[in-house]
């Protein structure tokens, strides 16, 4: 779970008693609560389609990714996926951030945009993560026009996955693409950011990095013990300390119960 204020800044310092968790509208007892800068497993999904040439967006995105990697710690791990009309796993999980920086630096833009396929590949790869905290970071300037997978297929896979997705897209270039990204990201408890230009990428990359380091981890044993494979809807409610502005909670929308 992450918490932000009305202008998008992450919020730290909250305690267990400030949170309530509901599963299918039934309040659950929070058995586990922690906030600490734990190691992270991150997949970077990088748009290298032809439109990334415009406004030198490819260079700005490379610099932002390098910035994110340079802020890591030795226990973090990363992989890199690039996409145009083709989706490529450039680097599988590694703790050598310098290797990933080199891979990013050599990317050249061209082709169409298979964003759904790239996210699907990222969701598949993240299953091999070694760390409890997992995230995918999508950087794109457009909308899908070349995928084999559909929006509904990717969204369904995201519902099954224990990972938060963060999406950054350029505001002025996204039409339906904005809806596409929000539709997938929202269900995972991640966040979307739509800066007016990629000149603002560093700010949002820093925000994502800080948020990943300062997330709250809440755990509970469901009162519904039935192993029926059905979707269980989760809602996290915040009772913030007095004096704070209205805060926004970002948490995954639910999970599928195991089957017996």
Please state what every model-predicted region is.
Residues 2-260:
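Scaffold/interface architecture of coatomer-like assemblies
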């Amino acid at each position: 779970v992450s918490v932000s204020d009305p202008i998008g800044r992450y919020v730290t310092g909250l305690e267990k008693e400030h949170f309530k968790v509901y599963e299918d509208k039934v309040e659950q007892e929070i058995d586990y609560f922690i906030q600490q800068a734990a190691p992270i497993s991150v997949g970077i999904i990088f748009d290298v389609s032809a439109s990334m040439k415009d406004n030198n967006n490819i260079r700005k995105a490379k610099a932002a990714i390098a910035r994110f990697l340079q802020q890591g710690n030795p226990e973090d791990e990363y992989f890199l996926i690039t996409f145009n009309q083709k989706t490529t796993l450039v680097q599988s999980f590694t703790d050598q951030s310098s290797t990933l920086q080199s891979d990013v630096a050599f990317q050249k833009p061209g082709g169409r945009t298979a964003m759904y396929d790239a996210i699907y590949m990222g969701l598949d790869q993240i299953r091999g993560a070694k760390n409890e905290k997992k995230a995918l970071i999508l950087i794109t300037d457009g909308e899908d026009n070349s995928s084999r997978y559909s929006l509904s297929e990717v969204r369904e896979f995201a519902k099954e996955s224990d990972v938060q997705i963060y999406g950054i897209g350029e505001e002025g270039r996204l039409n339906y693409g904005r809806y596409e990204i929000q539709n997938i990201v929202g269900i995972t408890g991640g966040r979307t950011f739509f800066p007016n230009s990629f000149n603002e990428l560093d700010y949002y990359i820093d925000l994502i990095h800080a948020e990943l380091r300062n997330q709250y981890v809440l755990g509970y044993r469901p009162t519904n013990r039935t192993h029926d494979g059905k979707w269980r809807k989760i809602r996290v409610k915040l009772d913030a300390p007095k004096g704070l502005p209205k805060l926004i909670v970002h948490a995954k929308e639910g999970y599928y119960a195991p089957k017996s």
